[in-house]
Amino acid sequence: MKALDELTFDNRFARLGDAFSTHVLPEPLDAPRLVVASPAAMALLDLDPSVAETPVFAELFGGHKLWAEAEPRAMVYSGHQFGGYTPQLGDGRGLLLGEVYNEAGEHWDLHLKGAGMTPYSRMGDGRAVLRSSIREFLASEALHALGIPSSRALCVIGSDTPVWREKQERGAMVLRMAHSHIRFGHFEYFYYTKKPEQQAELAEHVLNLHYPECREQPEPYLAMFREIVERNAELIAKWQAYGFCHGVMNTDNMSILGITFDFGPFAFLDDFDAHFICNHSDHEGRYSFSNQVPIGQWNLSALAQALTPFIGVDALKEALGLYLPLYQANYLDLMRRRLGLTTAEDDDQKLVERLLKLMQSSGVDYTLFFRRLGDEPAALAVTRLRDDFVDLAGFDAWAEQYKARVERDGDNSEEQRRARMHAVNPLYILRNYLAQNAIAAAESGDYSEVRRLHEVLSKPFEEQAGMEQYAQRPPDWGKHLEISCSS
């Protein structure tokens, strides 16, 4: 394991030059202190977890110190926000400190969010507040633990720096990690500003560093776009299968790597609600839970438009046509597994759709239903779950279909079925009310709840002794919370 001063930097994006980013130094926080750190994320940098408790850790990730090899840059990009094009966005409060490569040869971006004003801050102050930083940290690590591709979070650093939002809050910084911070909006920026040389340089950078296997294909850029389409179809299938609502699927929040990126007013479903809107600024429901699937395709089409200098329109349309079939196949496979099924039948999609319709009409907890379905043999499990439903006749009909489907699935033992279902159906998810409780404690100076919640969520499929309160339905006040974008 390494100490902080032993990290090895290789700042490949910074070498693209000033057309792609601007050199900016972080603005230090007052009295920086560790709120929470992720040992799993630290391991990706080969860092000894104990260094998180040292003063220099808070100073480095609180903007007071920099590695000599770091090259902090604010990236420029644009994007479609709620369907309308915004010509210039960029890192308004975040800095790419540099790229570190570990002993396995992996490169990781170190991106400091809340690092102060940049040329792209527009009307903002360049700061992030403690509550939004905690939410991003918890979500990044929780999604990774669920097997959902996501950026990672190394730590949150709190402070005494005052920041004004709807009220005065305390500033914080979160250190985000990813193999790249390039977004769909990077390509849109150079396309719409008519900078073909930079557009080509960016495309080569992404192809060579992040999709090198596509270089061997007859049409490398088309192969790369197809891979991006496939990754996004798989990602959004996992969002839908696990009830994750992103909240702000603007193209500047879409990673070129097909990972969950830029956490804002996100939420996991409590009761199943296909039309749930987690962002209270989304008045028309553009980014509602059920709309995430078509919006994913819309965003890919926006990226495709920006790639027309390199790829023919017909080829792009053909690649975009892969998205929905790939999404549907991935989603149905995940839902079969959540139902404990190991084989495929033609009517499985109808079985899933009928269940979700019943859950919607009865307000059934999405996560706990699937977990409890695997606790006992199918016949006993559906009997115990029956009382959660209002339409008893409808549920009874579904239960008979499900039991017959399980019977046809094979002669696996109940122990195997239970282990299989518990391996894909989490007991613990990041419910908004749990995050809110942890944030309230942290804002009063007690970081123990944030750390405990992070620890629980790092093992979402394992029953953890003494942690029953994290595996319960939310109280009435905690259901379907809508979250502000102000962060």
UniProtKB/Swiss-Prot annotation:
**Name of the top EC class for this enzyme:** transferase
Q: Where does ATP bind?
A: G90, G92, R93, K113, D125, G126, R176, R183, D262
Active-site positions on this chain:
D252 (proton acceptor)
Query: According to its UniProt record, which cofactors does this protein need?
Result: Mg(2+); Mn(2+)
EC number, UniProt record: 2.7.7.-, 2.7.7.108
Known catalysed reaction(s)? L-seryl-[protein] + ATP = 3-O-(5'-adenylyl)-L-seryl-[protein] + diphosphate; L-threonyl-[protein] + ATP = 3-O-(5'-adenylyl)-L-threonyl-[protein] + diphosphate; L-tyrosyl-[protein] + ATP = O-(5'-adenylyl)-L-tyrosyl-[protein] + diphosphate; L-histidyl-[protein] + UTP = N(tele)-(5'-uridylyl)-L-histidyl-[protein] + diphosphate
MF terms in GO? AMPylase activity; ATP binding; magnesium ion binding
What keywords is this UniProt entry annotated with? ATP-binding, Magnesium, Manganese, Metal-binding, Nucleotide-binding, Nucleotidyltransferase, Transferase
| Highest taxon, organism lineage | Bacteria
Which residues does Mg(2+) bind?
Answer: N253, D262
Family, per entry: Belongs to the SELO family.
What does this protein do, in the record's words? Answer: Nucleotidyltransferase involved in the post-translational modification of proteins. It can catalyze the addition of adenosine monophosphate (AMP) or uridine monophosphate (UMP) to a protein, resulting in modifications known as AMPylation and UMPylation.
Record-given protein name: Protein nucleotidyltransferase YdiU
Q: Give the originating organism.
A: Pseudomonas fluorescens (strain SBW25)
- Mind giving the lineage of the organism this protein is from? Bacteria, Pseudomonadati, Pseudomonadota, Gammaproteobacteria, Pseudomonadales
Gene name, please? ydiU
